[in-house]
Amino acid sequence: MSCSCFGASTVRQKRSDRQAHQPKQVEEGKHFTELLPGRRYEFVSISITFGAFAFWFFILHNNGALHAKTKNFSYNELRAATNNFHRSNKIGRGGFGTVYKGILRNGTEVAVKTLSAESKQGVREFLTEIDTISNVKHPNLVELLGCCVHGPNQILVYEYLENNSIDRALLGSKRSIKLDWKQRSVVCMGTARGLAYLHEELVPHIVHRDIKASNILLDKDFQPKIGDFGLAKLFPDDITHISTRIAGTTGYLAPEYVLGGQLTMKADVYSFGVLTLEVVSGKSSANINYGGGQKLLVEWAWELYEEGKLLDLVDPELEEFPEDEVLRYMKVALFCIQANASRRPAMSQVIQMLSKNVRLNEKELTSPGFFEDSGGASGKPSKHKSSETSTSHQMSSVPITITQVVAR
């Protein structure tokens, strides 16, 4: 059986509310099959049946509407395109599935993301991803081309982006591409524009919840596109925050979200700040060996900032770069990762700050927050810029201050 693909609908939020407890149920089911191995195939069969039912239920609630540019792919078509999902065509692994490169019969290159019916995300996140992006078009968002359901196989088909993801291009020991500063600045600015569109222009607004280097893909011209919307949450205009289960990637998670489950758009802003530090430094936020000790990237960046040595964070691979501009990008990142969520700028402000349209008021900058695996969040006051202790537990209403540059 193949699915139909469909545009955004007014029942998105209702569906999310209705299925809020599904992850727990799946976890329990998984545990049950481990206790009773003989029941495993029965459970898988139930999962497949439920998945099929959920798709058709969703279609009925959308009056069977199809988005004009999405396609209903057959399983055989995608299997042929990927050479039977051969490991040589594997190009990555997203938050909810393995991604393969495929070539359709007409020669079009595509990215084929396969999800298993046994995986913990189940139907909920699969439907979320389709529902979220099938009707969303922006130069800095990955385009969904279509989908397919065949037995236990849930498959999404995206446009193929030649230069893979930022983490493969920049982070780790096996860098595949050498990006100069101009290209890196384009990555940061393009990602900021994509997030600003999701947060402020789209209605209902969307919080991505999993902004990270592996979810920022590069096209043939090295323009960035945000992908992997499996964790996305919709925000109606009258909602300021959502209480939700914690989901995302360690190293990018805002402390107030980890500790309290309070999700706002400022969680994406925090993740963007971490991503920007990674792009400038060429170092992964997942490591904890920076600055000559057990430090996270955000800790090290703040330490260097306080010492007036922020340029020491810059990737040694960057042989030539405009120091003032690179410093600006790193300081904007520090504004984004402040422990106090209300002090972080909106993404539209971030775009202005990156583009030199505003002067950064560093007197308003307070220390970053970060979540440690040991179970705590930290936010240390600046040694010389502010006497205010700013932690994820103290939520101030003081907004970020930015001063317009006045032409002489």
Residue ranges and their predicted role:
Residues 268:
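Conserved catalytic-loop aspartate of Hanks-type protein kinases
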Residues 126-131:
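Regulatory alphaC helix of protein kinase catalytic domains
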Residues 151-159, 163, 167-168:
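A conserved loop-to-beta-strand element in the N-lobe of protein kinase catalytic cores
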Residues 1-68, 322-332, 339-408:
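Intrinsically disordered, low-complexity cytosolic regulatory tails
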Residues 100-117:
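Glycine-rich ATP phosphate-binding loop
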Residues 88-99:
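Protein kinase glycine-rich loop
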Residues 146-147:
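A short, aromatic-enriched beta-strand patch in the conserved N-lobe beta-sheet
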